[in-house]
Amino acid sequence: MKIKFELILLTVERHLPILEIGLPYIRRFINPDKITIIASKSCLEKINNIGFLDEDVVLLDEDNVVEGVTLDYVRFLVESRGGQAGRAGWYLKQLLNFAYAMRPETMDYYLTWDADTIPVQPISFFDDKGRMLLAKKSEYHEPYFSTIEALIGLKREVDFSFIAEHMMFKREYMLDLLRLIVRGGHLEGKVFVKNVITAIQSDHISGAGFAEYETYGTYVYKKSPKAVLVRDISSVRWGADLFGLKPSSSDLYTLSTRYSWASFESWKVRTVAQIRRRILLRILGKIWKFVIVITKYKAYILFKSKN
């Protein structure tokens, strides 16, 4: 039995070219029952002007997801803690992934997916027992766990990270977590946001002091371990270094021979070493693609024709 779920994409303007390329692959390889794009008002206007969306995609202003969860309010809280205002957008994205569960129309399950990431193989998010499949990663950042402990009283109990380019949320569990975050009080957007920002250590408020995926993963793995299954799944973050920010179908097919998804992050190269690395990876990408397309030409044509 297929478990229904919706997919939400939080995006900014610089990710729109990748999102335009990636959306057909999201439909093909993830096949959600509903897609919602969440962005600033100006970004939504640009999306409408580009006109690459189908009519069934829902557009939602980031300041209207849940009352009280706004960029201005997050910026105010970050600055009041002595943090840099420029980090507010980074925190807002994560807070919105949590807040989406508070919307009454939200489905029982919702998948968050990074807008700069393209799936290149079919990906399932539930096993045959209905357990949510969570990606297992190797990242470790101690301040995340200091915040988790201050926020909900849980320590790190696993030797891996839940931080990937997506997360499958069960609305029921997320609402329970939010109630824990507001400490039994009335579940309001402003209260939950304030409690999260307040829990971050002052030394890390201007950096990376909170991770929604690490927080949710830690909570669910502790409270409902039989509801999830952690898996190793192959992915790559430096798709842009290999193939640029406008990957072709042949680029994506090449990636699909090794990975389930690829991210195309628009990092700025600042040092000579970074420039050399990017040049080398771009050359390797061209060689890799040439070999794959030549040796697997029929499979490539099939991959291309289905999109």
Spell out what each predicted region is.
Residues 62, 113-117:
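Short acidic donor-binding/metal-coordinating loop in glycosyltransferase active sites
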Residues 163-253:
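Catalytic core and acceptor-binding pocket of nucleotide-sugar-dependent glycosyltransferases
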Residues 19, 91, 98, 105, ...:
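Nucleotide-sugar donor-binding/catalytic module of glycosyltransferases
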Residues 49-103:
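Active-site-proximal specificity loops/subdomain of glycosyltransferases
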Residues 236-307:
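Long, low-complexity C-terminal extensions of enzymes
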Residues 117-151:
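Conserved donor-nucleotide/metal-binding helix-loop-beta segment in metal-dependent transferases, i.e.
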